[in-house]
């Protein structure tokens, strides 16, 4: 792969990662399809995908830095001082409770989960995840018990963490699982989305660190320009995607995202079978 071609591939995949990582549509499904169409597959491709996820994580940190800073401050007894830090009722305990189920299962079944990274499993996950999105819209309480982040209970945070375990199934979508779970637990669509983004920071950083530790030997100095382009592109696109998504869900339901997932599942079938 020539230098210019590899940089173009990196930019395209960075756009795909940034657009889909935090939408309930499965970034994994999109990366598998696009990577296959571009001829970019194998161990280097898997490591590349892990690295550019860091760009998406950085976008969340930039978008929610006040809230994240506020969570840390509250833990050390510092009251909220800015509107963006919330009212002080969402704490690191909520985040921890949301992390525990998936962390435990992810560590226990890490190798088994990696063996599921193939088109057929991703295709099924896209469909089941789409059904869950529809179920969340149809079965959620008419009036949310937790309209805002600061209204969430520890139980709701833990149950969202349990739903997050579904995202260990490649193609399911971490944001789709957590947001759907939040809505079914009585959290508003917007608050569930915000919590999903906040939860993504420690979860994705931990998962990325573990994957990099296990695959760092596939990295070479020659790969740095390609990885850097993918990282920066994913970061910039994710910034726009997160902001747009949070505005969009104030006006529409998740039904269109579910339908889109079914279309992507059909595309996986056409491309790979």
Swiss-Prot record:
Where does it reside? Answer: Cell inner membrane
* Ranges that cross the membrane: 45-65, 90-110, 116-136, 154-173, 190-210, 222-242, 252-272
**Catalyses which reaction?**
di-trans,octa-cis-undecaprenyl diphosphate + H2O = di-trans,octa-cis-undecaprenyl phosphate + phosphate + H(+)
- Please name one Pfam family that this protein belongs to: BacA
Main location per the UniProt record: membrane
Q: Cellular component per GO?
A: plasma membrane
EC number(s) reported in the record: 3.6.1.27
Ordered alphabetically, the record's keywords are: Antibiotic resistance, Cell inner membrane, Cell membrane, Cell shape, Cell wall biogenesis/degradation, Hydrolase, Membrane, Peptidoglycan synthesis, Transmembrane, Transmembrane helix
A single Gene Ontology biological process assigned to it is: response to antibiotic
Membrane protein topology class: Multi-pass membrane protein
Query: Mind telling me which InterPro entries this protein's record contains?
Result: UppP (IPR003824)
Q: Which GO terms describe its molecular function?
A: undecaprenyl-diphosphatase activity
Entry similarity comment: Belongs to the UppP family.
Misc. remarks from the entry: Bacitracin is thought to be involved in the inhibition of peptidoglycan synthesis by sequestering undecaprenyl diphosphate, thereby reducing the pool of lipid carrier available.
| Function (record text) | Catalyzes the dephosphorylation of undecaprenyl diphosphate (UPP). Confers resistance to bacitracin.
Record protein name field: Undecaprenyl-diphosphatase
Lineage at the top is: Bacteria, Pseudomonadati, Pseudomonadota, Gammaproteobacteria, Enterobacterales
């Amino acid at each position: 792969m020539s230098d210019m071609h590899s940089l173009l591939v990196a930019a395209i995949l960075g756009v795909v990662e940034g657009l889909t990582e935090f939408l309930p549509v499965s970034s994994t499904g999109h990366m598998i399809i696009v990577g296959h169409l571009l001829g970019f597959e194998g161990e280097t491709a898997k490591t590349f995908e892990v690295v550019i996820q860091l760009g998406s994580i950085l976008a969340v940190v930039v978008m929610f830095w006040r809230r994240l800073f506020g969570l840390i401050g509250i833990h050390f007894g510092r009251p909220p001082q800015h509107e963006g830090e919330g009212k002080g009722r969402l704490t690191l305990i909520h985040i921890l409770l949301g992390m525990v189920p998936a962390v435990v299962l992810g560590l226990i079944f890490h190798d088994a989960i990696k063996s599921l990274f193939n088109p057929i499993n991703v295709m099924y996950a896209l469909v089941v995840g789409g059904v869950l999105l529809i179920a969340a819209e149809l079965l959620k309480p008419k009036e949310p018990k937790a309209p805002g982040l600061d209204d969430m209970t520890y139980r709701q945070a833990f149950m969202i963490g349990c739903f997050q375990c579904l995202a260990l199934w490649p193609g399911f979508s971490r944001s789709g699982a957590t947001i759907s779970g939040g809505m079914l637990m009585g959290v508003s669509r917007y608050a569930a989305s915000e919590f999903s983004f906040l939860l993504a920071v420690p979860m994705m950083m931990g998962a990325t660190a573990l994957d990099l530790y296990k695959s760092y030997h596939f990295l070479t100095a020659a790969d740095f320009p390609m990885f850097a382009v993918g990282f920066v592109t994913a970061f910039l696109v994710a910034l726009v995607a997160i902001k747009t998504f949070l505005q969009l869900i104030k006006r529409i339901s998740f039904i269109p995202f579910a339908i889109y997932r079914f279309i992507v599942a059909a595309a996986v079938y056409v491309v790979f079978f």
